[in-house]
């Protein structure tokens, strides 16, 4: 069945009202699952804490997490879409001057959603947003066991290949 033009417009308007103008739908192998990336929707601190718990990160005081988010150049959420209550299942944030350089921190995808290419889609979205700001150089720090994930996406590893990788605007 083909959706009517009005239904498609209503759906697009709903997504924009929930996630903002810069949202992006993520392709998924499951047609019943809708995932949305956005840097416009506010990040709920409790949901972020639950995501961090799920990926095994230590807890930080929520006051400090809120301050870190407020001082970040870019905050990106990946939500499992539900018109009543979207659920945060992925996250990344960037710091920097927003002109020349940025650093990516705290990239996480909930374990139930890992292995489907969502981390890659999250990072592509982050880089697209930084490109739109005309940021030329991006660095990131990651745990040693995931640095190869970034290398496979074209990030240049630091010489020791331990924790840091770089991306340069073409």
Residue ranges and their predicted role:
Residues 110, 143:
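Residue-level recognition of the GNAT/N-acetyltransferase active site
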Residues 123, 128-142:
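Conserved GNAT acetyl-CoA-binding A-motif
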Residues 63-84, 88-108:
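A conserved beta-strand-loop-helix scaffold within acyl/acetyltransferase catalytic domains
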């Amino acid at each position: 069945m083909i959706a009517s033009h009005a239904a498609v417009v209503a759906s697009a308007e709903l997504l924009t009202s929930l996630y903002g103008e810069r949202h992006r739908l993520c392709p998924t192998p499951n047609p019943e699952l809708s995932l949305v990336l956005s840097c416009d929707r506010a990040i709920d601190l409790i949901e972020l804490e639950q995501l961090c718990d799920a990926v095994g990160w230590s807890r930080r005081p929520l006051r400090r997490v809120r301050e870190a988010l407020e001082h970040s150049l870019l905050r990106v959420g990946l939500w499992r879409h539900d018109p009543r209550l979207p659920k945060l299942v992925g996250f990344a944030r960037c710091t920097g001057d927003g002109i020349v350089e940025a650093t990516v921190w705290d990239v996480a995808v909930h374990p139930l959603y890992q292995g489907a290419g969502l981390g890659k889609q999250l990072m592509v979205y982050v880089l697209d947003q930084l490109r739109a700001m005309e940021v030329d150089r991006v660095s990131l720090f990651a745990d040693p066991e995931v640095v190869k994930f970034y290398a496979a996406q074209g990030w240049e590893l630091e010489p020791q290949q331990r924790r840091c990788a770089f991306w340069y605007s073409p």
